[in-house]
Amino acid sequence: KKAEKIWSFFVGESGLSLYFGQMHSHTAEYSDGAGTLEDAYEHAMQAKDVDFLIVTDHSNYFDTKSSATKTSYYDLSSLEKTADGTMTKWEEAKKTAEKYNAMSTDFIAAYGYEMTWSGGPGHTNTFNTYGTVSRNNGELNEKSNSYAGMHLYNDLMVNANKGLDVNGEAVAAGVKTKWL
């Protein structure tokens, strides 16, 4: 017996949009990249078909000796200050992103950080945080238990940058994460 089967589908209005951009970039002003933060946002805003840029400079740039405590996550005064001492470098970078967001309704500028562990198996981009977590912070830097320290903050978003094991699983900071 032979039967002919016809398969079809209909896609209605999705209500969703596709956006293009970069979620992992560095500057020379705050990390080991090139140019200033303003240069990066200006370039991305002028580039064709770029909807957003999230700059994620290395976390160790913001570290100070006093930032290795749990309270430093909320108390930005412990973070590295700008040259004129008026705000922390973290606050300055976040304000620069806000400035570029106010300039356009067609482009999103955001600032996060790349959690950078010395000698660790991976780095992670971290977004939507009030402050930064020091790689020297034993209380928040719990890498062996599924980011137990950073999970205390419900609104943050983390993605693994570097490190895959032989099974293709992300190995970020010693934590294996299955891709779903």
Label for each model-derived stretch:
Residues 5-7:
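Extracytoplasmic/periplasmic beta-strand context in beta-sandwich domains
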Residues 10-180:
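Extended, charged catalytic domains and RNA/DNA-binding interfaces, predominantly
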Residues 1-2:
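Extracytoplasmic/surface-exposed domains of secreted proteins
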